[in-house]
Amino acid sequence: MTNVLLVALGGSIGAVLRYLLSIFMIQVFGSSFPFGTLLVNLLGSFLMGAVYALGQLSHISPEIKALIGIGLLGALTTFSTFSNETLLLLQEGLWHKAILNVLLNVTLCLFMVYLGQQLIFSRV
């Protein structure tokens, strides 16, 4: 039951962070491209890589993995919003932005997971 509460706590923090970061990115860059979703996916991917690496090295407890890896990062990152925003760009005829959105999210998020892992593994 403790892990369920930790996931809920982490999820509430991640959801609020996602909301605040998305609003911030709209204020900075406007709403013509989904920069907020890209930012939270990149940040979450990097942190997920780091949490995974720490878990592999047994430096974090299962409770912390539940709090951060499942709760916080699960709520912070968002594949459904990414998919919806990409579809909206396609429906508006903005093919170049839709393709850019897919390429940036997929390639950069994969790289950020790798970078997060390497940051931790290189310090061991």
UniProtKB/Swiss-Prot annotation:
Record's catalysed reaction(s): fluoride(in) = fluoride(out)
**Membrane-spanning intervals of the chain:** 20-40, 60-80, 102-122
Q: How does this chain sit within the bilayer?
A: Multi-pass membrane protein
Name one matching Pfam family.
Answer: CRCB
Name the job this protein performs.
Fluoride-specific ion channel. Important for reducing fluoride concentration in the cell, thus reducing its toxicity.
Of which family is this protein a member? Belongs to the fluoride channel Fluc/FEX (TC 1.A.43) family.
User: What is the name listed in the Swiss-Prot or TrEMBL entry for this protein?
Assistant: Fluoride-specific ion channel FluC
- What's the source species for this entry? Shewanella frigidimarina (strain NCIMB 400)
